[in-house]
From Swiss-Prot:
It comes from Homo sapiens (Human). It is a multi-pass membrane protein. This is Transmembrane protein 275. Its main location: membrane. Residues 1-20 are annotated as: Disordered. The gene is TMEM275. GO terms for cellular component: membrane. It is found in: Membrane.
Length: 177
C-alpha cells in the first residue's frame, strides 16, 4: 500500500466548520429574500391590475389576492431578517473579536489602491480597498501618510496643427524614490 501524501498549504475546513455560522434548521437568508422579491413583484402586478379593474374590493378578487401577495412578501422579508440574525448568534466569538483576515471589525487602516492598464488615450482604472498592511497591498500606490490623496492626471493627448497629425503624450510611470 503506498504511503499517504501530505498536501502542502492551508488545511481545508470540514463542511461542519464552514457552516458553523448558520443554524442548521433555518433556511438561507438569500432564499427568503429571493422569495420575498418574487412575491413582492407578483403582488404589485396583481394589485395594480385589480386596482384598475374596479374599485369595489368585495367584487374584485385581484385586489384581494394582490394585497395578500404583498403581505406574503413582507413575511418573507421578515423571515430573511430573522434567519440572518439567528445565524450570527451561535458563533464562539463575535465578529469584532475576530482576528485580521477573519471578517473582524476595526481591522486597522485601509489603503485605497488604484491600478491602471497600459497608458492609452482611453484608459480604464480599477479601484480596490484593502488593508494597508496586507499581502494584497503593493505599497506603491500609497507611499505617503495620506493614502487617499490622488494626483491630477497628466494630459493624455495634445493636438498639434501640423501635417503629421496628433502627437500623443501618454502618462509616464514615476520612478520609485
Amino acid at each position: 500500500m503506498p504511503p499517504a501524501e501530505k498536501s502542502e498549504g492551508p488545511p481545508v475546513p470540514a463542511p461542519a466548520e464552514r457552516a458553523r455560522g448558520r443554524v442548521p434548521g433555518l433556511p438561507s437568508p438569500a432564499l427568503c429574500c429571493a422569495c420575498g422579491l418574487c412575491a413582492l413583484l407578483a403582488g404589485v402586478n396583481v394589485t395594480l391590475a385589480g386596482a384598475f379593474a374596479s374599485f369595489l374590493p368585495e367584487h374584485n378578487a385581484l385586489l384581494v389576492v394582490g394585497l395578500a401577495l404583498l403581505v406574503l412578501a413582507l413575511g418573507f422579508f421578515a423571515a430573511c431578517c430573522v434567519c440572518s440574525r439567528r445565524g450570527l448568534a451561535p458563533r464562539g466569538r463575535s465578529a469584532a473579536a475576530a482576528g485580521p483576515g477573519q471578517g473582524g471589525g476595526r481591522a486597522g487602516p485601509v489603503a485605497l489602491e488604484m491600478e491602471s492598464s497600459e497608458p492609452t488615450a482611453q484608459d480604464t482604472t480599477a479601484v480596490q480597498l484593502s488593508p494597508a498592511v496586507s499581502a494584497a497591498s503593493s505599497g506603491c500606490s500609497s507611499p505617503g501618510p495620506s493614502p487617499l490623496a490622488l494626483e491630477a492626471p497628466a494630459p493624455a493627448a495634445v493636438c498639434a496643427l501640423r501635417s503629421e497629425g496628433v502627437q500623443l503624450n501618454p502618462p509616464r510611470a514615476r520612478a520609485a524614490p
